[in-house]
Amino acid sequence: MFKLERKDYKKVINLVKSQDELSVFSVINGENPGTIYANNIINPTAALIKTSECNLIAGNPNDEVFNSQVSEELDFWDQLVPDSLEWMDKIPTIHKNNFIRKYKRRHYVLSNDNFVDYTDPLKIGYILEKVNISFLKESSLENSEIILEVLSENWGSEEIFKKHGTGYLVRNDKIIVSWVLSDCSFEKTIAIGIHTDKRYRRNGFGKIAASATVKDCFAKGYKKIDWLCVDSNKGSIAIAEKLGFKLINLYYSFTSYPPIENLKDLSESEWYQWGEYLEEASKTEECLLLECIYAYIKSNDVEKTINIMTNIKQKNIELDYLTFKNWIINLQSYDMCSNFTKKAWINFLNENIPNVD
């Protein structure tokens, strides 16, 4: 496996057959930061492309020497996108986590003709602003550091973001409550992503910021806008479709942990399925035990949670029960974990936390 120099990135472009992950083409074209590994410098036939948005593996899936070296460049927790169906069965055999699990993603596209502007007014006390990196660096606004980190990872520099990207945010005096940023661009297509502080959701802030960002993307000359999200993210799907985005493809990625973008993206039964999967996988990969507990807690299953915690205790692995208690209390504020008020859980905590309330 060889780490390509930037001047050689375009040698792998014909290996990429899928069109879902725009960041892959942004990196190949030199517009966004990223790293590319290939099985040959002169004439590559297999490649691992790492971007700020994804890791994608493409080309010939049968180069066993290349495949054996892929795990050296991926962390246990890294997600991995197969470029073709031929890679689907290969990924669990070449990833550090042999139990990595596939999940479904959505690819939406918007053209100017289909755009539906969102014109509802902002609530009193909130303002809409174009993202200004210099202003954010000098401000003390809550969430500004998160935005700056994302922009740095995606674009590398303020100058490149100004040239190719855009974004809008909604804020009050002290807090940025929602923001939509362009993640990457390639030729006449740009991809955008949305985030709203969980304390301020269901207020229309995301739609307002997204609508403004879309208009600015078209004003900059882009012809199409990409919107990618997990298949379970109902909120993101609703906003995209309200603005006129059209679903053009469903595709798969692989993950070591539940692929959620919001706490309630998965139902209790879906969380339970993840708990079962992680419980079985943890017999080989012990580091998945904590993820297993988190999944069973979110599935609202007290008995399974206690059983797993008891098994961990018997292995002489320490757990911070007070942290779990406080985390569950926080989840209950989102109408989750209602069963964790039952006597069985309270008694279990009493046994493991001195003087627990």
Q: How would you name each of these model-derived features?
A:
Residues 1-21, 115-155, 266-283:
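Short amphipathic alpha-helix that is part of the acyltransferase structural core
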Residues 153-198:
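A conserved beta-strand-loop-helix scaffold within acyl/acetyltransferase catalytic domains
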